[in-house]
Every structure is written in structure tokens, then in C-alpha cells.
Amino acid sequence: MQCLVIYDIPNDRARQRVADACLDYGLQRIQYSAFAGNLSRTHQRALFGEITRRVKGHTANVQLFVFDSKTWSDRRILEQQYDDA
């Protein structure tokens, strides 16, 4: 199932630990504090447990959304890059 993990974590070290966990589970960074990818239900639970351990003792808001393939394929994406220099 397609998953989206988003988070708001003020502590730099805890935030990096969450990013590392998402990467360890094969998710791709789609924004600074957002990762997406395909995870089984078992891996969803395991990742969320790992994230919970990594943010222990820190302020954190972490959300994991699960989408069926139809909903995921219907999403709209706008990505632009400019040379803002």
C-alpha cells in the first residue's frame, strides 16, 4: 500500500533519526519532512514503532497516511524549479 509519512519535529537530531528510519524502509523523500513509498501493513507498523522509539523524549508530530492504489494514482503533483539567484 502506498504510504505518506509527514512530521514536524523541532529537534534536529530526532528529525534526522526519523528521516533515516524512513529511508531504511525504502521510502523516498518528497519534501523536507515528508516521505512516500510502498509499505506492507507489517512494515507500516514496524516503521511507526521505530519512529516512536527514535523520537522518545522529544516533541514530535508524526503522521502516517495509507492510500489505495486508485487514490494514490489520482493525486496531483506540482513540482517547479527555478534559479532564484
Curated annotation (Swiss-Prot):
Catalytic EC class: hydrolase
Does Cytoplasm show up as a keyword for this record?
no
What's a Gene Ontology MF term here? RNA endonuclease activity
Q: Which UniProt keywords apply?
A: Antiviral defense, Endonuclease, Hydrolase, Magnesium, Metal-binding, Nuclease
A single Gene Ontology biological process assigned to it is:
defense response to virus
* Entries under CDD domains matching the protein: Cas2_I_II_III
Q: EC number(s)?
A: 3.1.-.-
Binding-site residues, Mg(2+):
8
Needed cofactors: Mg(2+)
Q: How does it assemble?
A: Homodimer, forms a heterotetramer with a Cas1 homodimer.
The Swiss-Prot or TrEMBL record describes its family as follows:
Belongs to the CRISPR-associated endoribonuclease Cas2 protein family.
Q: What does this protein do?
A: CRISPR (clustered regularly interspaced short palindromic repeat), is an adaptive immune system that provides protection against mobile genetic elements (viruses, transposable elements and conjugative plasmids). CRISPR clusters contain sequences complementary to antecedent mobile elements and target invading nucleic acids. CRISPR clusters are transcribed and processed into CRISPR RNA (crRNA). Functions as a ssRNA-specific endoribonuclease. Involved in the integration of spacer DNA into the CRISPR cassette.
Kindly provide the name given to this protein in its UniProt entry. CRISPR-associated endoribonuclease Cas2 2
- According to its UniProt entry, this protein's organism is Chloroflexus aurantiacus (strain ATCC 29366 / DSM 635 / J-10-fl)
Q: What is the lineage of its organism?
A: Bacteria, Bacillati, Chloroflexota, Chloroflexia, Chloroflexales
Name of the gene this protein is made from: cas2-2
